[in-house]
From Swiss-Prot:
Molecular function via GO: metal ion binding; metallopeptidase activity
Xref: Pfam families: RadC, UPF0758_N
Entry protein name: UPF0758 protein PST_0473
Family indicated by similarity: Belongs to the UPF0758 family.
Native organism: Stutzerimonas stutzeri (strain A1501) (Pseudomonas stutzeri)
Alphabetical list of NCBIfam families matching this protein: PRK00024.1, radc
Biological process terms in GO annotation: proteolysis
Record motif JAMM motif, residues: 173-186
The MPN domain, residue ranges: 102-224
Signal peptide: none
Membrane among keywords: no
Length: 224
């Protein structure tokens, strides 16, 4: 049966317009993105099939072009469309973050860092550079690979803070394993960076670790 033959209240697009996007299942949201199905499958059937093939919506969103295009109903055009949608979401969060003080919008900080780092397959270390009113000046990824005391250089963080004319910074890195618990090395690194940045009167306000779920704030746990 075609989706056109379904009751209006059950059609994904009409359901979204009536109840909002949050009311839709992963399959219904994906069906709206797909727009059409394939022979023998409606858009919703195809969406359910793809979610089963990938294992989760997250895995589908994180797939590279080859992985994505290997599945029924998908190809380079859909991949490009999906990447554009994801990037618009990231830019929306970044713009929202820049409008307000980072300290007055802690959830906006979490949302942005989660969108920026959670899906990265390798460890990244970055900084949110803030002005004297704690408004965001810029976000920069500074280091790639294993994030420990040997791979993150305080002098490079200091150099970028000076270049941005920052008054404060929020540190962040991701744990691709999904476990957002700080290691002893994470705590030692945070202290080294605090000490280095204090020499140029730049405050470290927090260090967020991004894994599955909500990013962990080291400041909230008293680990700063």
């Amino acid at each position: 049966m075609s989706i056109r033959d379904w009751p209006a209240s059950e059609r994904p697009r009409e359901k979204l317009l009536d109840q909002g996007a949050a009311a839709l299942s992963d399959a219904e949201l994906l069906a709206i993105f797909l727009r059409t199905g394939v022979a023998g499958k409606s858009a919703v059937d195809l969406a359910r099939y793809l979610l089963a093939e990938f294992g989760s919506l997250r895995a589908l969103l994180e797939a590279d072009l080859d992985q994505f295009s290997a599945h029924l109903g998908l190809g380079p055009a859909k991949f490009a469309q999906l990447q554009a949608v994801l990037e618009m979401g990231r830019r929306h969060l970044a713009e929202r973050l820049r409008r307000d003080s980072a300290l007055e919008s802690p959830q906006a900080v979490r949302d942005y860092l989660k969108a920026r780092l959670r899906h990265e397959p390798h460890e990244l270390f970055g900084c949110l550079f803030l002005d004297a009113k704690h408004r965001v000046l810029a976000f920069e990824v500074l280091f790639h690979g294993t994030i420990d005391g040997a791979s993150v250089y305080p002098r490079q963080v200091v150099k970028r803070a000076l270049a941005q004319n920052a008054a404060a910074v929020i540190l962040t890195h991701n744990h691709p394993s999904g476990v957002a618990e700080p290691s002893q090395a994470d705590r030692q690194l945070t202290q080294r960076l605090k000490d280095a940045l204090a020499l140029i009167d730049v405050r470290v306000l927090d260090h967020f670790i991004v894994g599955d779920g909500e990013p962990l704030s080291m400041a909230e746990y008293g680990w700063m």
